[in-house]
Curated annotation (Swiss-Prot):
Subunit text: Homodimer.
Protein name: Phosphonoacetaldehyde hydrolase
Molecular function as annotated in GO: magnesium ion binding; phosphoglycolate phosphatase activity; phosphonoacetaldehyde hydrolase activity
Family: Belongs to the HAD-like hydrolase superfamily. PhnX family.
Cofactor note: Binds 1 Mg(2+) ion per subunit.
PANTHER family, alphabetized: PHOSPHOGLYCOLATE PHOSPHATASE, PHOSPHONOACETALDEHYDE HYDROLASE
Length: 264
């Protein structure tokens, strides 16, 4: 079997180490309404279409209970729409600062292309958001062959439609000749639902939620424990393989090809 294409996520996988751009904004739009949410809660739905992310936060029992305490009712769809509009406005202003390629990504992409591998991408950002991120990332040397946003298909993650559209545009089939790489639970589900080899990247991921400085300065035992928690979470949600950094991706690809593995 030959791997012919790799489909990458964006924030937390190829750009924006730790996926911090949306995090503070999600927390802020709730805080403004007197409803405090934690960073851990804000990260949990990461990877979904952003309005679905806001909706998922309002459906978390603790957050819903706190909202009910403040407003004497549960969040309505109008509340969700209002918060999402605020989210977009704030995020658009800061996105250019969070589009730098993660260290090692450009080199891995160049190596994959030398092998004739096509590079696709999916995201939880809207097309308008990605117009900002993709433009800035390209200026810094990262530009996949194709990009699909949830706006381009009937539904975003965990549905497989973005991966299918990548496959069609890149001209690659069957789906087990492709690898999906991401940093969230929804990425793992997207890849598995699409019938692709699915790989979770840990360092720089939203699931780990650490800055580069925090990773460098953290006690090695504590860091290892956190890495293993994320690794297990990825596997429990469908990852065939996990890697700590993007530099390990090619060895995973070679393993798949040499072993003639079958997706299960």
């Amino acid at each position: 079997m030959k791997i012919e294409a790799v489909i990458f996520d964006w924030a937390g996988t190829t750009v924006d180490y730790g996926c911090f751009a949306p995090l503070e904004v999600f927390m802020e739009i709730f805080h403004k309404r007197g409803v405090a949410i934690t960073a851990e809660e804000a990260r949990k739905p990461m990877g979904l279409l952003k309005i679905d992310h806001v909706r998922a936060l309002t459906e978390m029992p603790r957050i819903a209970s706190e909202w009910n305490r403040v407003f004497r009712q549960l969040p309505t769809e109008a509340d969700i729409q209002e918060m999402y509009e605020e989210f977009e406005e704030i995020l658009f202003a800061i996105l250019p600062r969070y589009a730098s390629p993660i260290n090692g990504v450009k080199e891995v992409i160049a190596s994959l292309r030398e092998r004739g591998i096509k590079i696709g991408s999916t995201t939880g950002y809207t097309r308008e958001m990605m117009d900002i991120v993709a433009k800035e990332a390209a200026l810094q040397g990262y530009k996949p062959d194709f990009l699909v946003t949830p706006d381009d298909v009937p539904a975003g993650r965990p549905y497989p439609w973005m991966c299918y559209k990548n496959a069609m545009e890149l001209g690659v089939y069957p789906m087990n000749h492709m690898i999906k790489v991401g940093d969230t639970v929804s990425d793992m589900k997207e890849g598995r639902n699409a019938g692709m080899w699915t790989v979770g990247v840990i360092l720089g991921s939203s699931e780990l939620g650490l800055t580069e400085e925090e990773v460098e300065n953290m006690d090695s035992v504590e860091l290892r424990e956190k890495i293993e928690v994320v690794r297990n979470r990825f596997v429990e949600n469908g990852a065939h393989f996990t890697i700590e950094t993007m530099q390990e991706l090619e060895s995973v690809m070679e393993h798949i090809e040499k072993q003639e593995l079958i997706i299960s």
